[in-house]
């Protein structure tokens, strides 16, 4: 087995290579080899090279897997996808754009720019805790699982043909950690050090308190070209197309109107197991609209050929245009089997009036989800009862023996309800003013120390109980108003 696949540092040598301060700088300056370090500091070696990383256990796919199980490895290439992106991150804006630098705070970047960049490893969507090698052919992990040596594929290339090396990976992590978008800086602040061992090996050491979920996240960070940013300011918001190495690159665009991502036909990684069946469209065109309804009209006119719908009223009442009727547009629901997000109001616990949990429970009882779902959401919603909805981590029923083993040391420090049935939200009569639930809410408020002063609910100092709602869209006013009327009844 080649050295690139089975790096065998001692723990002491590895920590020295990755330490902050003069010791780490001296090692980098002298180019102390792994062999010399190992000879000077005998000790535990790295484990065998792995083809991926998993947070909770073994990898689902073997080292010789041919493709991810949910893709068609023989999917035809070609065509164009035209859409409004259903999700975005960093400084991306779905309504307009003025920069292609998506990894900083400044500017409004075009969504989907990340498709232009390769990463060390990529996620396998049927394993939410696992990543498999893309630029990194394999990874070796220290015994304490805090130091990771990524072994790069020698064939990895940027779009200009230049090799993608460990220097680029180290530069990327350091740059994103110190100059990147605040989200990236926060994540990468848990890295202790990044060290280039040789052109095809980069060693990343995590801080002792870092979560075991960090390594797959670090392995999913975009890889930048060090050479490119030696002549370009990383922190500058610009429409210069950055040099990258991924399956797509920026093609035609009009600022604020559209951007086309062009498939790179000779992308170096197109035949890897993690890539087969992906990046099938020749062109992915992102369209920009400042109004949701205008974006929907673009679908009806054929400007878009894909749309993910987030508005239940539109889904229930407006997908009846001719292209749907004659089958040119297919309306379908797909179970995604992924952890669901949460939508709701989050109570500001820094406000003293919300400190008592009985007060918060009362607020929950006053919201009639069943009425709201029937009358406002067209029956399309299901009530969220966990931050881990639609995942194996959602609490259901009584704690299992394994869960109790984790919980018992905390008995007396957490609520006893933790040891009973998992919480489920109240179910109303659907009338909009369920008297039983409102009566229970009133009782809880009185138990929490609130009293009646005529029609007002006041605290011990006579201050009225007021609530301010902050929403990110005026569309939710129709949801707030019935809820507010129920709160006024209390």
Task: State where each predicted segment sits.
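Aromatic- and charge-enriched surface segment that lines or borders ligand/interaction sites
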Residues: 71, 75, 96, 103-108, ...
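Append "and occasionally in soluble cytosolic enzymes with long acidic Gly/Pro-rich linkers
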Residues: 355-485, 489
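N-terminal lobe/hinge region of extracytoplasmic solute-binding protein
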Residues: 44-143, 174, 243
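Gly/Pro-rich hinge or "lid" segments in bacterial periplasmic/extracellular proteins
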Residues: 106-127, 174, 218-285, 290-297, ...
